[in-house]
């Protein structure tokens, strides 16, 4: 149910940017307050990304007020912070559906709105897209402006600097708004973040701020900023130095929660020539005390009552697979000080908080830089360490060349703990772990494991730790484990060997991963054999051969793209063995999987027991 818009009298007048631009500027502070309150109540009703959007309310209002969107292009990096943008661009009455099946997309999405000029979800893409749009705008000579909004967390990724370097060289008109809240999903790390953090200290921050104030009062922008920088800050490392060296004109920092200052500054900068950076300081979670105090914990939230100032208590239940991994990592680190945990800025999500606290010298946050994280692991392996790279399936895509060139080619024993394999649900197509089995299976020297439950996950992680002939990967899903009894003792599994879980007749289900429980349920109605294959690569050749010889039909089951996945590996093996056999592949279709709850998505894709049974019966009937 949507909120009663009559409770928000100014916001009610600004359902679109055109309506917003008709408001007198004096009403913008009230509009920002109402927008923040609407966002707070809306996310409380629907769940979703929370703290980031609270921090960009004033910026969103100012951008749509000054720029002629959608004619002028506005690109949001990642998109966590774009909920206010959705509210102001005609989607206010559907905000309660965000991230839900058939509801609003969780991120800016081109198919959803003309105001969403570039579909996003992964970090660091906005500057490249904005540069291309700026070049196109110059070719068209229609007076179109281009703005990219990027957070300080995304500035730790190399793609951003590749794009900025190119933009500085081409020198097209574009604006990059650096939203500096000193907080991405995990604390930012590295020299750049330390550089930005200096803004908050004493004379250094005050001097830059005063220079920017003079710019705001109408002085010739580029000339005056250069003059003040030279006079006051010569010989010091100033915030703008990095951007100036890359060919950008730097303005800031300014208060990102002062909507009037933002409007005036954006007006001043709108017609400046060449690439520009506006550096704004914001607070993630602004306006809601619990989120201000704990922006990481309030990054994304379930449904909650804002008036209670706390998230709903989580019911005691099964551990998540991320927690299973985190516990294993701590257990193995106690035994071996050469175990090193690496994450690309996903400490909380990957279950590594306890490890980072207990073993700080063995913990490495590579920031939002997946390529670097993978090759960092390769370098450690060269020196005899035991690197464990904990990474989401969707983000491993970003380190694919490094996986091939730096790890597998050299047969380096790097263990990849791949979280969020398969359906992740509400974050949609940018985050579904649909492709990892396919893109890893074709890489020589890889060992790929898919546990069916938490105990098997623990043993497979240990197997990967023990394996020193090359890289290995353990791929597990988001969410709660299955409830299997965990065995504390760790035993390395025989490489490339599966286990028969149920003996039946005629039909054999070859299962890869946590779809095992559903496969067993479906098998009861079919009196089918079920095999927990365990290894996607190498396949258990003897077991596949045995199943083909003793059954009429084989069915492969995986929560991965059918094309190139584990089932394709079974078909390739049967071809090599010259054993023609009917094989039904159950998995993800050749399409990007939309958002919805995991259960809804799995049901729609017929990956639950009911759906598997229906697919198998239809195959047998034909």
Swiss-Prot record:
List of residues binding thiamine diphosphate: 80, 121-123, 153-154, 181, 288, 370
Keyword RNA-binding in record: no
GO molecular function: 1-deoxy-D-xylulose-5-phosphate synthase activity; magnesium ion binding; thiamine pyrophosphate binding
Coiled-coil features, chain-numbered ranges: none
Biological function: Catalyzes the acyloin condensation reaction between C atoms 2 and 3 of pyruvate and glyceraldehyde 3-phosphate to yield 1-deoxy-D-xylulose-5-phosphate (DXP).
Keywords: Isoprene biosynthesis, Magnesium, Metal-binding, Thiamine biosynthesis, Thiamine pyrophosphate, Transferase
Binding, Mg(2+): 152, 181
Subunit structure: Homodimer.
GO BP terms in the entry: 1-deoxy-D-xylulose 5-phosphate biosynthetic process; isopentenyl diphosphate biosynthetic process, methylerythritol 4-phosphate pathway; terpenoid biosynthetic process; thiamine biosynthetic process
InterPro entries named among the record's database cross-references: Dxylulose-5-P_synthase, THDP-binding, Transketo_C/PFOR_II, Transketolase-like_Pyr-bd, Transketolase_BS, Transketolase_C, Transketolase_CS
Protein name from the UniProt record: 1-deoxy-D-xylulose-5-phosphate synthase
Signal peptide: none
Lineage: Bacteria, Pseudomonadati, Pseudomonadota, Gammaproteobacteria, Alteromonadales
Catalytic activity: D-glyceraldehyde 3-phosphate + pyruvate + H(+) = 1-deoxy-D-xylulose 5-phosphate + CO2
């Amino acid at each position: 149910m949507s909120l009663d818009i009559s409770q928000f009298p100014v916001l009610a007048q600004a359902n679109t940017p055109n309506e917003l631009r008709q408001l007198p500027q004096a009403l913008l502070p009230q509009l920002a307050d109402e927008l923040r309150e609407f966002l707070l109540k809306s996310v409380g009703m629907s769940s979703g990304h929370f703290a980031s959007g609270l921090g960009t309310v004033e910026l969103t209002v100012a951008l749509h007020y000054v720029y002629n969107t959608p004619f002028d292009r506005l690109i949001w990096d990642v998109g966590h912070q774009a909920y206010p943008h959705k509210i102001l661009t005609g989607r206010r009455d559907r905000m309660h559906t965000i991230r839900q099946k058939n509801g609003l997309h969780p991120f800016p999405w081109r198919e959803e709105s003309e105001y969403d000029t570039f579909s996003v979800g992964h970090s660091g893409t906005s500057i490249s897209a904005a540069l291309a749009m700026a070049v196109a705008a110059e070719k068209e000579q229609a007076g179109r402006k281009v703005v990219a909004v990027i957070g300080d967390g995304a500035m730790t990724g190399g793609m951003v600097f590749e794009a900025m370097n190119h933009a500085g060289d081409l020198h097209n008109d574009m604006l990059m708004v650096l939203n500096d809240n000193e907080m991405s999903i995990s604390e930012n790390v590295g020299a750049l973040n330390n550089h930005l953090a200096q803004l908050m200290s004493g004379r250094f921050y005050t001097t830059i701020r005063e220079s920017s104030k003079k710019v705001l009062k109408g002085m010739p922008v580029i000339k005056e900023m250069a003059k003040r920088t030279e006079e006051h800050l010569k010989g010091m490392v100033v915030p703008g130095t990095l951007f100036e060296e890359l060919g950008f004109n730097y303005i800031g920092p300014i208060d990102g929660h002062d909507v009037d200052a933002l409007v005036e500054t954006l007006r001043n900068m709108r017609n400046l020539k060449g690439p520009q950076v506006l550096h704004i300081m914001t607070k993630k979670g602004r306006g809601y005390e619990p989120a201000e105090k704990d922006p990481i914990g309030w990054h994304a939230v379930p449904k909650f009552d804002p008036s209670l100032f706390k998230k709903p208590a989580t019911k005691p239940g099964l551990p998540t697979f991320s927690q299973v991994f985190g516990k294993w990592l701590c257990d193995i680190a106690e035994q071996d000080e050469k175990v090193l945990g690496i994450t690309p800025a996903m400490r909380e999500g990957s279950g590594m908080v306890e490890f980072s606290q207990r073993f700080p010298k063995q913990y490495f946050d590579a920031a939002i830089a997946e390529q670097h994280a993978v090759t960092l692991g390769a370098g450690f392996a060269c020196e005899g360490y035991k690197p464990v790279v904990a990474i989401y399936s969707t983000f491993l895509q970003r380190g694919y060349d490094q996986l091939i060139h730096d790890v597998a080619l050299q047969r380096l024993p790097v263990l990849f703990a791949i979280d969020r394999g398969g359906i992740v649900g509400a974050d949609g197509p940018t985050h579904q772990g649909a492709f990892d089995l396919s893109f890893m299976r074709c890489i020589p020297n890889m060992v790929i494991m898919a546990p069916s439950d938490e105990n098997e996950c623990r043993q497979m992680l240990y197997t990967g730790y023990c394996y020193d002939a090359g890289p290995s990967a353990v791929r597990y899903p988001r969410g709660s484990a299955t409830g299997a009894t965990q065995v504390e003792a760790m035993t390395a599994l025989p490489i490339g060997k599966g286990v028969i879980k149920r003996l039946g007749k005629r039909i054999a289900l070859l299962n890869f991963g946590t779809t095992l429980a559903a496969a067993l349920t479906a098998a009861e109605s079919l009196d089918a054999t079920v095999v927990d294959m365990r290894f996607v690569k190498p396949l258990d050749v003897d077991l596949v051969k045995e199943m083909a010889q003793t059954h009429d039909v084989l069915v492969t089951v995986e929560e991965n793209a059918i094309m190139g996945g584990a089932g394709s590996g079974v078909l390739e093996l049967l071809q090599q063995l010259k054993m023609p056999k009917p094989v039904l592949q159950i998995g993800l279709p050749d399409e990007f999987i939309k958002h919805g709850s995991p259960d809804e998505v799995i049901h729609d894709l017929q990956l639950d027991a009911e759906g598997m049974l229906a697919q198998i019966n239809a195959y047998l009937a034909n």
